[in-house]
Design a protein with these regions (language model features):
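Buried hydrophobic positions in well-ordered alpha/beta secondary-structure cores of metabolic enzymes
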Residues: 25-28, 81, 148, 189, ...
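Generic N-terminal amphipathic, Lys/Arg-enriched alpha-helix
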Residues: 15-26, 53-55
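Glycine-rich phosphate/diphosphate-binding loop of Rossmann-like nucleotide-binding domains
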Residues: 20-37, 41-43, 167-237, 249
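N-terminal glycine-rich phosphate/adenylate-binding segment common to multiple enzyme folds
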Residues: 63-172, 258-260
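N-terminal beta-loop-helix "entrance" segment that forms/cooperates
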Residues: 45-71, 241-243
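Short, low-complexity intrinsically disordered segments enriched in A/P/G/S/L with frequent Arg
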Residues: 2-3
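Glycine-rich phosphate/nucleotide-binding loop
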Residues: 59-62, 244-341
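Short acidic loop-to-helix transition motifs that present clustered carboxylates
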Residues: 58, 127, 234-241
């Protein structure tokens, strides 16, 4: 995560940043192109210099190199100040073996860049309130929280095997977490809360899982370092219900990989449109991966009608979290709000 914002230090300060662009597949290049236009306007207005390096990943990399993420393309991303990605995948590549499909490139990119924290905001824009599936009385209280999900640990990255036992198949999936993995994602949760409304909810299943009990022990140690943050804990089943019943209670949710995968998808639905939802993946330092949560929309590719707002908001997140440019990020979000009006 970037260090705390200091308004006096940033006054009249211009920056030079190298951004690696992954245009992606199908309609995705159209949204990245629009996000770059917005970034260029910000650079022009504030005297920043953004330089762009193109990297290939996903379907376009398979077509060009026969590999969803060649080593040279990964290096372009690792050497950048940050990475802006559109969306990858599409029907053209669905018949490929699992390790050769576009999505494998994204997993390798996250791992190769050491990105262990996925941040996905859930925000209801007033102009789209009627599109939310929640009751008006719930929406009117406001929805503006972020799910901080551990990205490269837990059951998705544990041992997976199927064995024969007593004449039948038994499937086993292991859910490991080490203290240092929990501490680094927990710290990002607290730091994110410090930049928002200073409220953090750790979501787990500590009444059943040893991993969740370890999460709580580590989070309690971290809590001492952040006395300004109002810290609480919630079981994942209750959290899934509360996101629908009373989402206004949440500011920042931090949780493990599988729980975060499910809860962040649920959270994106209550906002009314996945076309408005950005995300970031962060690790040690300030370099991150920023992308919209929606897919590559192959059905409308080439028609210039795809909604670029989630990608534009992802660029705003990049300015805020990787480049320490909160004022510039605010300007982009205000512009989006004006367009919706």
């Amino acid at each position: 995560m970037s260090r705390p914002y200091n308004s006096n230090e940033r006054e009249n300060r211009t920056m030079q940043k190298n951004i690696t662009l992954i245009y992606g597949d199908c309609s995705s290049p159209e949204i990245v192109t629009q996000a770059v236009r917005v970034l260029d306007k910000i650079a022009e207005k504030h005297g920043h210099t953004f330089t762009y390096t193109r990297a290939y990943m996903g379907g376009e990399a398979i077509d060009k190199f026969g590999d969803p993420l060649p080593a040279a393309e990964l290096e372009k991303c690792k050497n950048a100040d940050s990475v802006l990605l559109g969306a990858i995948g599409g029907p053209k590549w669905e018949g490929l073996p699992g390790d050769q499909r576009p999505e494998k490139g994204l997993l390798r990119l996250r791992s190769g860049m050491g990105l262990y924290a996925n941040n996905r905001p859930a925000k209801i824009w007033p102009q789209l309130a009627d599109a939310s599936p929640l009751k008006k009385s719930i929406v009117d209280k406001g929805i503006d929280f972020i799910v901080v999900r551990e990205l490269i640990g837990g059951v998705y990255f544990g041992e997976h095997k199927t064995i024969e036992e007593n004449g039948e198949k038994v499937a086993i999936d292991v859910m490991p977490y080490a203290e240092h993995e929990i501490e680094r994602i927990g710290r990002i949760g607290f730091e994110t809360a410090m930049k928002r409304r200073k409220k953090l909810t750790c979501v787990d299943k500590a009444n059943v899982l040893d991993t969740s009990r370890l999460w709580r022990a580590v989070m309690h140690r971290l809590q001492v370092e952040y006395p300004e943050v109002e810290y609480s804990e919630m079981f994942v089943d209750n959290c899934a219900m509360q996101i629908c019943k009373n989402p206004a209670q949440f500011d920042v949710i931090v949780t493990e990989n599988m729980f975060g995968d499910i809860l962040s998808d649920e959270a994106s639905e209550v906002t009314g449109s996945i076309g408005m939802v950005p995300s970031s993946s962060l690790g040690q330092g300030t370099c991150g991966l920023y992308e919209p949560i929606h897919g590559s929309a192959p059905d409308i590719a080439g028609q210039d009608v795809v909604n670029p707002i989630a990608c534009i908001l992802s660029a705003a997140m990049m300015l805020r979290y990787s480049f320490d440019m909160p004022a510039e990020a605010d300007e982009i979000e205000a512009a989006v709000n004006a367009v919706l009006d």
